[in-house]
């Protein structure tokens, strides 16, 4: 499972002209689910994201996690993160979990994240989403947990 996390000043997801999720200061998390991923894999990655210290502390160093920074999380599914890109000129999405299975796992991970953290917003699984954000830094990291 892979996550691309970005520290943002604000972010929102719009589907068909309607805002489906919006945060101010916090983390925009794009989540890619692979064929072999499980709920346990996802929980491990979510736990890492919640504890990952990429917010400035009182000394101006990256010492605080999203909770300590009083931020929010905008969680967006993105199967393209699982693409194989080493060969050729077209991404291969074979490593991504099939949509029906991925949707169920994504929904479980949303619920898990909400059980661990109060301010969680989401996109819409498999929708054509418009993601608006203002990067803070920019500060962007790729996180991965093997199944």
UniProtKB/Swiss-Prot annotation:
Instruction: Give a Pfam family name.
Output: Tyr_Deacylase
Provide GO CC annotations from the record.
cytoplasm
Residues making up the signal peptide according to the UniProt record: none
**Keyword annotations:** Cytoplasm, Hydrolase, RNA-binding, tRNA-binding
Name any Gene Ontology BP term. Answer: D-amino acid catabolic process
Provide the primary localization: cytoplasm
Catalytic activity reads: glycyl-tRNA(Ala) + H2O = tRNA(Ala) + glycine + H(+); a D-aminoacyl-tRNA + H2O = a tRNA + a D-alpha-amino acid + H(+)
Described by its record, this protein's role is as follows: An aminoacyl-tRNA editing enzyme that deacylates mischarged D-aminoacyl-tRNAs. Also deacylates mischarged glycyl-tRNA(Ala), protecting cells against glycine mischarging by AlaRS. Acts via tRNA-based rather than protein-based catalysis; rejects L-amino acids rather than detecting D-amino acids in the active site. By recycling D-aminoacyl-tRNA to D-amino acids and free tRNA molecules, this enzyme counteracts the toxicity associated with the formation of D-aminoacyl-tRNA entities in vivo and helps enforce protein L-homochirality.
Q: What's this protein's family per the entry?
A: Belongs to the DTD family.
The free-text domain note is:
A Gly-cisPro motif from one monomer fits into the active site of the other monomer to allow specific chiral rejection of L-amino acids.
Q: What is this protein called?
A: D-aminoacyl-tRNA deacylase
């Amino acid at each position: 499972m892979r996550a691309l996390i970005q520290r943002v000043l604000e972010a929102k997801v719009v589907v068909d002209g309607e805002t489906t999720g919006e945060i101010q200061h916090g983390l925009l998390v794009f989540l890619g689910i692979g064929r072999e991923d499980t709920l346990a894999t996802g929980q491990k990655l979510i736990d890492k994201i919640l504890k990952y210290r990429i917010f400035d502390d009182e000394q101006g160093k990256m010492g605080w996690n999203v909770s300590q920074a009083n931020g929010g999380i905008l969680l967006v599914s993105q199967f393209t993160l699982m693409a194989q890109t080493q060969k050729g000129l077209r991404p291969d999405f074979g490593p991504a979990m099939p949509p029906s299975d991925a949707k169920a796992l994504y929904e479980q991970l949303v619920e898990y994240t909400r059980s661990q953290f109060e301010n969680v917003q989401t996109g819409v699984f498999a929708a054509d989403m418009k993601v608006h954000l203002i990067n803070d830094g920019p500060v962007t990291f790729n996180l991965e947990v093997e199944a």
